[in-house]
Design a protein with these regions (language model features):
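Conserved strand-turn element in the central/C-terminal portion of the radical SAM core barrel
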Residues: 112, 119-122, 194-218, 237-252, ...
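N-terminal pre-triad scaffold of radical SAM enzymes
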Residues: 39-82, 89-113
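Catalytic cores of alpha/beta
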Residues: 153-161, 214-226, 282-294
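Conserved, mostly hydrophobic/aromatic
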Residues: 15, 44, 73, 170, ...
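Auxiliary Fe-S-binding modules of radical SAM enzymes
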Residues: 1-32, 228-326
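Charged helix-capping and loop-helix junction motifs
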Residues: 127-132, 187-189, 220-224, 254-259
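Flexible, acidic/Gly-rich N-terminal and inter-domain linker regions that tether
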Residues: 1-71
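Core AdoMet radical
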Residues: 81-100, 104-195, 204-208, 233-238
Length: 326
């Protein structure tokens, strides 16, 4: 297997595009095969160096509207379908957003995104409020601005772009085949339609998914290739943090090597992208640093939407100790 990984890596470094059959061989490396996974991480890092350079990208998010979501995503604390005791509030005011954005900027983080619960932007009034917030952030900070507001259309994407947004975040979450098992109130196609509208509007796209939803290894491979087919260059990979009260609240955590192996696989499939640590990476325990020396070159840092996240200074130390620049 080590010989296969080396030969495949050498081919990718020469411009070869990996196929699904080869990816299945990688994803099926046993999680307790430490030596082979170490080799995989080493070659994943070589691919990152050649195609994505040595600069790491840091982003941070703020929960701009919480709870009462109409959608039934089985992993989500903010769905109104489940009793999770999540804090609920309407869209927050600009002063609170600006205060958080300035904290993020002072920490040396590159990107900042407001994230709101709900199927999408729920009214023209909400859109106008968001535009005022982003226009203000564009004026009052030097941050690169991102947005994450669910399913939107082309016109809404254009308005957000005009207000100062450069990137929109919209995950596929899992493979097309498995999507109906985690959400029934909208479809995988709905998500892809939003992604296409975002791209047509000229916004950069941040699109990844969640590992540990009960999917098969095959679904992780399928998701990687589906994301590659969408032309994505920023791929946030979350690890399920089971939330009590949701249908997936008792799901077992993925073991660290399964997570690291999957992130390395995404580097093999999409060599020139930002592979981004996102929520739930606490499941890696003391192996978090291995991702940064195994192909990961971006991170969502600080707190997440409804869970405690990572320490910014610790993330910076891990990144620089892995040979990446911030």
């Amino acid at each position: 297997m080590k010989k296969f990984i080396k030969e495949l890596s050498d081919k990718i470094l020469d411009g070869y595009v990996i196929n699904e059959e080869e990816a299945f061989k990688i994803i099926n490396i046993e999680e307790n095969d430490e030596d082979t996974i170490e080799v995989l991480l080493q070659y994943s890092n070589d691919i990152r160096k050649k195609f994505a350079g040595n600069k790491a990208d840091l982003c941070s998010i703020m929960n701009g509207k919480s709870g009462r979501c109409s959608e039934d995503c089985k992993y989500c604390a903010q769905s109104a379908h489940y009793n999770t005791n999540v804090c609920e509030y309407a869209l927050i005011n600009y002063e609170d957003v600006l205060e958080r954005a300035k904290e993020v900027q002072a920490q040396g983080i590159h990107r900042f995104s407001l994230v709101t619960s709900g199927r999408g932007i729920e009214s023209d009034e909400e859109l106008e409020s968001l535009i005022k917030i982003y226009s203000g952030l564009k004026r009052d900070t030097n941050l690169k601005l991102c947005a994450s507001h669910g399913i939107i259309n082309y016109d809404q994407a254009m308005r957000l772009k005009e207000s100062g947004i450069s990137m929109y975040h919209h995950n596929v979450e899992t493979s097309e085949r498995y999507y109906g098992d985690i959400c029934t109130t909208h479809t995988y196609e709905d998500r892809v339609n939003t992604i296409n509208d975002i791209k047509e509007a000229g916004l950069d796209l941040c699109c990844g998914g969640i590992l540990g939803l009960g999917e098969k290894r095959e679904d992780r491979v399928k998701m990687a290739f589906e994301i590659r087919g969408l032309g994505v260059k920023s791929v946030p990979l979350n690890v399920l943090n089971p939330i009590k009260g949701t249908p997936l609240g008792e799901n077992p955590l993925l073991v660290p090597n399964e997570i690291l192996k999957t992130m390395a696989l995404f580097r093999f499939v999409i060599p020139d992208s930002y592979i981004r640590y996102a929520g739930g990476r606490i499941a890696l325990g003391d192996k978090q640093h291995k991702g940064f020396s195994g192909g990961v070159n971006a991170a969502l840092t600080g707190n997440y939407l409804t869970t405690v996240g990572s320490n910014v200074d610790n993330d910076k130390d891990m990144i620089t100790c892995s040979g990446l620049e911030i």
